Amino acid sequence: MITMKKVLYLFFSVFAVCCSYSKAQVANEDKHRLIVTTDLGGTDPDDVQSMIHLLLCSNVIDIEGLISSQVWIDDPDKTAKISEVVEQFGEVLPRLNKHAEGYPGLNQLRAIIKQGQPVSNMTGVGSGKDSPGSELIISVVDKKKDQRPVWLAAWGGMNTVAQALWKVKHTRSEKAFKKFISKIRIYDVLGQDDAGAWIAKNFPEIIYIRNREVYGWGPSDQWI
């Protein structure tokens, strides 16, 4: 079990390493835009560790979404688990701000924590199945004043990203859809549902980095 004491310990441990880096700042226009979909809150601690690492690097990345996602089975809303890690980040934020500029404030992070699809796999994608997470993805990519591409990093399942693509595909012209997908980049840690395969097969023009297998786990055929 990941307790808040352990989370704080991890924050301070990684913070100690971060302090050894240069104070050189990254200009806003040079930062990568990022939305993360994550199944944080499950039995494995890996996404908690990844979230801590990400937040400690958030002065050099524009984090624009933290979305609670499904994997291959229906799972309850775990946005509260993401919020717990963000609140613990707030405990070390004053110290981080002494060493580097550019960290997002707590309210900024709180506002971008969203729930993704409530139903797993492609069953959760289609007409009338929009979620706060899929709507956030669309609104972030649509920002007209920011032409930097948006990276979508999937630490869990891909069906919230799939829902965003499904909606734009079915509600806009082909030209507008092409413009939309030209602004996204996807990194899929591992196909943890069938939605990633659906995206890759239906939209091959999307820049999509896919891990199709990892040691000790071979996804089923429909996932790859």
Predicted regions and their residues:
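Bacterial Sec-dependent N-terminal signal peptides
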Residues: 1-26
